[in-house]
Amino acid sequence: MEAEFSRDGISLRRYQVADIPLLYEAVRESISDISPWMPWCHSDYSMEDSKAWVISRDEAWVNEVELSFVITDAQTGAFLGAVGLNQFNRDHQFANLGYWVRRSRARGGAATTATLLTARFGLRTLGLQRIEILAAVGNRASQRVAEKVGAKKEGVLRNRLSLHGLPHDAMMYSLIAADLNV
């Protein structure tokens, strides 16, 4: 299964052991931006957390539990963030798509391009019928990414996310093959 893609100066690839310190650096740089929406990103995030995550990616991929990609600058190879498909529903052929981009590269289009590439991979290569993107109601940056790739806003799901132990409403977006001409 193809696992590397590029478009508009952005590349996606699977995690490698060499990404451990790069992931750590990107997360530490971005805690204040990402932490409200992704509880795994917290002030105590450590190099060991990065190592555990990167090491777990191969097994998650093989078992098709979560297909995770590193977002890189296609020219320099710089680590920009991550994107992936998870929460697969095999009976109904859909999955969740999530993403984050490091603070120093936010608002540069990396998340949008990575989301588009990953959605196409899910719909075309994996044969999914639907990709879902959930964004906390207060997470406008994530909502903008979903809207830029053409995801359809389906509404607010009450108490759909648990962030830092508290329930939060989420905006539900979806993509199907027709939305992306796949």
Where are these regions (language model features)?
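Conserved GNAT-fold acetyl-CoA-binding loop/helix
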Residues: 35-56
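Acyl-donor (CoA/ACP) binding surface of acyl/acetyltransferases
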Residues: 1-22, 26-33, 68-182
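Short loop/turn motifs at secondary-structure junctions and domain boundaries
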Residues: 59-64, 151
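A short hydrophobic/aromatic micro-motif that marks alpha-helical segments and, especially, helix-coil
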Residues: 45-46, 61, 180
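Intrinsically disordered, low-complexity regulatory segments enriched
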Residues: 42-45, 58, 66, 105
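Short, polar/charged, Gly/Pro-enriched helix-capping and turn/loop motifs at alpha-helix termini
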Residues: 37, 41, 64-68, 129
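A generic secondary-structure signal
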Residues: 56-57, 121
